[in-house]
Amino acid sequence: MNAYKWGDRMKHIGIIPNRLKDTDLKVTERIATWFNKSNLSAYTTPDIAEHIQAHTIAVSEKELYEICDSLIVIGGDGTILSVAEAASIKDIPIVGVNLGRLGFLADIEPQEIEVSLQKLLEGVYEIEERMMLKATIISPEDEKYVFHALNDINVTRGSFARLVEFEIRINNELCDVYPADGMIVSSPTGSTAYNLSAGGPILVPHANTYVVTPICPHTLYAKSIILSDHDTIQIATLEEAKDMALSIDGRLKMYLTPQHVVHIERATQVTKLIKLSERKFFDILREKIVERRR
C-alpha cells in the first residue's frame, strides 16, 4: 500500500497519449471519463483536449510538467522513454498504458484500465526508481550539450561507410580501442533493449551498474564491460569518421565529428515508475524471449 493516494497528494494527473498508438483517442477518452466520474482533475495539451468529449484541463506541454503530480502515458515503452527525461527533472512518477507489443515499462493493459485506475486511487501500487544515464558532449569549440537517458546512449557510425575505431576510457584510463559500427552504453532498464540485441548482458532493473557494448565489433575478443554506477565512460574516435550519430533512448539527438568527446555517467535524477502489475521482471523477460523466437 502506497502512502500517497491519488486524490490525496497526487491531485493533478496528466494524460499523454501517443497519437500513433491511440489514433482515435478512445483510450484517452476512457481514462479522462473515469477521472470525471472520480472528481479528479485530468490535464492534457490543447490538441488532445479539443478531440475528446470528456472534460480535461488544457495546458501547454511545459505547464503539464509544472502542474502535474503524476503522468499517465498511453502508448508503450517508447512513449514512456520519450517523456522520461522531462518527468525525471520534475520528479514526476509515470504509469504507462500499453498499446504496443509486450513491454517492460508500460504496466497497464487496455482491458485493465478502470481496475488499475481504482488501485491508483486507493494507493495500491508501488513506485520503482530506475537509474538514468547522463551524457555530456563536448564540441571542438568547447560547447557542452547534456542529455539524459532511461534506456541507453548510442554512438554509431551513422552514414559513414566504414568501421570506426572507438577509444573507450573508464575513469579517465584507457580501456581499449574497438573497431566497430558503434557503442551502446546501457542502464539496467535498457539492458533488455538494443544492448541485448547486440549480444550484451541482461542487468536486473535495480542493479547499481551499467554496461558498455560494442555494435558489430571487428574483433573476436571485444565483449561488453559491466561498470559500477560510480564509474565514468569517455567515448572518442581515432579517425576522420563523418556524421557519427548520437542517439538517446532511440532518438537521434545530434551528429558528431571526431573532435567531439562523449562523457557518460550515472545521472543524479531517476525515473519513477508506478507499478501495479503482479508480473515480475523475469516473467516479462521470458515472455519477450518467446515472442522473439516466433
Language model region names:
Residues 2-70, 74, 111-126, 137-147:
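ATP/NTP phosphate-donor binding region
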Residues 20, 77-79, 102, 189-191:
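Short glycine-rich anion-binding loops that position phosphate/pyrophosphate groups of nucleotides
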Residues 24, 78-84, 192-197:
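Short glycine/serine/threonine-rich phosphate/pyrophosphate-binding segments
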Residues 90-108:
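Short, acidic/small-residue loops that bind anionic groups at enzyme active sites
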Residues 102-181:
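Catalytic core of DAGKc-family lipid kinases
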Residues 155, 160, 171-174, 221-294:
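ATP/nucleoside-binding phosphotransfer catalytic cores, i.e., glycine-rich phosphate-binding loops
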Residues 168, 190, 246:
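Short aromatic-centered micro-motifs
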Residues 176-180, 184-221:
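Gly/Ser/Thr-rich active-site loops/lids in small-molecule metabolic enzymes
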